[in-house]
């Protein structure tokens, strides 16, 4: 059914519905899945300059396949407190501030495969509580994709959570076979091609980055692991980061700021991090010094293989 959101026409999907955008079709509007299940959004058509491309809230079993989103003012796809989201063969291009690619808040059982994201903010971001969404973020798989961040992060995990309950977790997350084409961010607090920066009493654990190729960093960091209290976005520090694997990572960038690993205090630390087969400019890394990491306090059990 159709509804008016501001000055924009929006299609609101019902349960057990397929929306098909035929190749050559251009929709100047958005698609919304709110409290529905078993929805498919298919085809090779385009969403052109929506305020937000596709919104999925309080829903389950939503498939997006083949769509192109051009110049979304905000998220290309956002997920909130939803499960069973699958996104395949999606292309996204955006140029304005805050125009993230795929952001998921308190979502579980998410599969992203074969997407191309060229965004002027985070390409992929995973959070727990934000806005009116509550709960953990777990079992997220991102495969065979290309990320190009004009600004901010190609991959961002953490940041937002729930300090009132203090028990939300981001876990069982895999990024595999990913090409990162660009990372350009002036502010060091928001740098990192692969970033885990937990705040708001979040805990991030059991996360793997594997077979990641970074082609260029105009300004930024390769890795950014941090338990933080960002006064702009958080109401408390994160709980910790642990059991993280970086395997088969290569980067050919020559102008890279030092990566960062930093805990918050003795009870909110970073621990058990593995760097395996990391290759920078053709040279396999054998030490933290060669990896160019600024290792600060409250960090334990860092291994290089």
Task: Describe every region a protein language model picked out.
Residues 1-6, 11:
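Single conserved hydrophobic/aromatic residue that forms the stacking wall/gate
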Residues 6-8, 16, 22, 28, ...:
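Surface-exposed or flexible loop/turn and strand-edge residues in extracellular/cell-surface modules
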Residues 12-14, 34-35, 57-58:
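Flexible, charged surface loops at secondary-structure boundaries
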Residues 18, 37-47, 60-71, 83-94, ...:
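Right-handed parallel beta-helix
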Residues 21-22, 42, 197:
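Short His-Asn-centered micro-motif
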Residues 48-55, 71-75, 95-103, 119-134, ...:
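Extracellular beta-strand/beta-solenoid scaffold signature
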Residues 184-305:
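Extracellular beta-rich repeat passengers
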